[in-house]
Amino acid sequence: MSKRILYQEQARRALSQGMDILAEAVAVTLGPKGRNVVLEKKYSCPQIVNDGVTIAKEIDLANHMQNTGVCLIRQAASKTNEVAGDGTTTATVLAHAMIKQGLKYVASGANPMALKTGMSLATQWLVSQIRDLAQPISDHLAIKQVASLSAGNDDQVGEMISQAFEQVGADGVISLEEGKSSQTQLQITQGMRFEKGYISPYFATAGDTVVLDQPYILLTDKKITLVKQDLLPVLTLVSRTNRALLIIADDVEKEALATLILNKLRGIIQVVAVRAPGFGDRKKALLEDMAVLTGGQVITQEAGLSLETITLDLLGEARRIEVGKSYTTIVADSNKQQVKARCEQIKQQWARSDSSYEKQQLQERLAKLSSGVAVIQVGGATEAEMKDKKLRLDDAINATRAAIEEGIVAGGGSTLVHFIKPLIEWSHHLKPEEQLGAQIVAKALSAPLHRIATNAGQNGSLIVEQVQNQPNLGYDAANHRFVNMIEAGIIDPAKVTRCALQNATSIAAMVLTTECMIVDKPSGDK
């Protein structure tokens, strides 16, 4: 296909036009008075969402040049979501503001590379200030406040998430399910999570995660190599039951993996393969733990079992399994007594061990097996409401985890606004053109609060000015008042604020230093 090449100002303008479209679509959701966005779905009812990264993923423009800009700014949202799990809209708004301001400086003759250096140095300084300012949290009320805010000021959801973290701990597993009623409910159940995801992305045919309901589980410490001997017996058995299958094995060779993917894509059986976690004896022990949890058996030569002669009673079972790129969560209902007995056995091993390393490994196994999984069954009057609530809950869980990890700062965009003057003063020691880069970041810091106020029907510039002149206060958009944000419980996780700022600066710097763009010519163009 022939290409179209754009240079300098023309290239940057085309990128900027695409970014304007995406930023506006995402920014309308920011803050407590943010609006919803309706997404058309080809084969189901439209989805109503308030989640920045979900909206960003849906935007695909016909104009290739503008769409390149969309893809670039989408990265700021995606990367923030990947690392912090929330703050995607803030990252998009910040990146857009930096790019708009930066393009003005570039058009007036500023050196883009010097601007990039200044922006990078300014962001490093801001990150260190945010870390110093962050207040650690651990109490029930603070956790509830973070979760409530991120879920759209829903106190009931905040209380539920706070209870879930109390039950399973800061590192525990909280799983979201679509409920069967209009009420959202919390349930603590048997379960485990380990840090291994699907072997091939072809297992994830919709989105980044695969969910299996009521699946069978094959556990083996061997490498699955031969299709006929190792795979066909278990695939034949499970396909007759019309249930899904999770394979946890040492590895799956190319030919066997291709067979699994083909069966999955053809709809013959819903199957996912995952590499077993750990190494050596620890791998065997973890597989045994999973076998106890799911009521199955580990297929090993030592036990005299083989994949050729497998039967259904050797397979484990679970209520639900979620597999992502780098994790697998097993939610099981039964086998409480067996799990309890296994935990006692691990405790005895821990007491007998003299090795600090072995004790640490046993402690990790015990935590995985005993803490269980908090399952939040998301309810809603309609399917659209349920899906929107599920996205909000996911954001709230991630935000709460981030707050526990790195602490909290004042929310509502006020923390960033209060850093504008100190940043400009700090930047005076930089070179003149690097100072312009720091100014780009400083001017963009007001963008989230400006948008929150605008979405609440207020004059954004006026609100920003008032907050900037009152160091201890911020703007409560839900009640249209100026308050001490932390005392009022309007707080943001420091990690979310930090990641949004870092990723926005990274994308903005890349755009400002772009001098040429090469895109496909639309069909029909000569």
UniProtKB/Swiss-Prot annotation:
CDD domains: GroEL. One of its GO terms (molecular function) is ATP binding. GO terms for cellular component: chloroplast. Its main location: plastid. It is found in: Plastid, Chloroplast. The keyword Transcription does not apply. ATP binds at residues 29-32, 86-90, 412, 476-478, 492. GO terms for biological process: protein refolding. Its EC number is 5.6.1.7. Pfam families: Cpn60_TCP1. It catalyses: ATP + H2O + a folded polypeptide = ADP + phosphate + an unfolded polypeptide. InterPro entries: Chaperonin_Cpn60_CS (IPR018370), Cpn60/GroEL (IPR001844), Cpn60/GroEL/TCP-1 (IPR002423), GroEL-like_apical_dom_sf (IPR027409), GROEL-like_equatorial_sf (IPR027413), TCP-1-like_intermed_sf (IPR027410). The keyword Nucleotide-binding applies. Keywords: ATP-binding, Chaperone, Chloroplast, Isomerase, Nucleotide-binding, Plastid. It comes from the Eukaryota. SUPFAM superfamilies: GroEL apical domain-like, GroEL equatorial domain-like, GroEL-intermediate domain like. Together with its co-chaperonin GroES, plays an essential role in assisting protein folding. The GroEL-GroES system forms a nano-cage that allows encapsulation of the non-native substrate proteins and provides a physical environment optimized to promote and accelerate protein folding. Forms a cylinder of 14 subunits composed of two heptameric rings stacked back-to-back. Interacts with the co-chaperonin GroES. Belongs to the chaperonin (HSP60) family. This is Chaperonin GroEL, chloroplastic. It comes from Cyanidioschyzon merolae (strain NIES-3377 / 10D).
